[in-house]
Swiss-Prot record:
Organism: Escherichia coli O7:K1 (strain IAI39 / ExPEC)
InterPro entries recorded: NTF2-like_dom_sf, SEC_C_motif, UPF0225, YchJ-like_M
Domain of life: Bacteria
Family label: Belongs to the UPF0225 family.
Pfam families the UniProt entry points to: SEC-C, YchJ_M-like
Name of this protein: UPF0225 protein YchJ
HAMAP family: UPF0225
Gene name of the encoded protein: ychJ
Length: 152
């Protein structure tokens, strides 16, 4: 039986993010890279995460931290709510909510990730955490207020 991709695309993993995580293909744009990196977190694949971080970030030094995080975190879902890039600019952004449980507590990472394209490959550079008011609609698309959803 086929497994749906953890990235939330509703497509089989083998047809969605697996070709990127396995190295068969290079992610064609920042959104595909973001989704495949989320899958790597779900599947505890530190090698892919390090390979897709921009070389200037020194991600190899984060291997132990990544491995420790894998042991305590269960990823529950990804919602991409905004993306923008132009291949001519070689820079792109993807905004998302990644839900997880850690130590029995649920949480969410809300980030606007920045990506850079070099030599035909997109890399994750860094991210910022956008600020939402407690009464703003939650960016995950649930229809709830932020304070009653991902802002808890």
């Amino acid at each position: 039986m086929s497994q749906l991709c953890p990235c939330g695309s509703a497509v089989e993993y083998s047809l969605c993010c697996h070709p990127y995580v396995s190295g068969e293909k290079v992610a064609p744009d920042p959104e595909h890279l973001m989704r495949s990196r989320y899958c790597a977190f779900v599947m505890k694949d530190a090698d892919y995460l390090i390979k897709t971080w921009h070389p200037s970030c020194g991600a190899a030094a984060l291997r132990a931290e990544l491995m420790a995080g894998f042991a305590h975190t269960e990823w529950l879902g990804l919602t991409v709510f905004e993306h923008c890039w132009q291949d001519a600019d070689n820079i792109g952004f993807v905004s998302f909510v990644a839900r997880f449980t850690e130590g029995g507590k649920t949480g969410a990472i809300i980030e606007r990730s920045r990506f850079l394209k070099e030599n035909g490959q997109w890399y994750y550079i860094d991210g910022t955490r956008p600020q939402f008011g407690r009464n703003d609609p939650c960016p995950c698309g649930s229809g709830k207020k932020f304070k009653k959803c991902c802002g808890q």
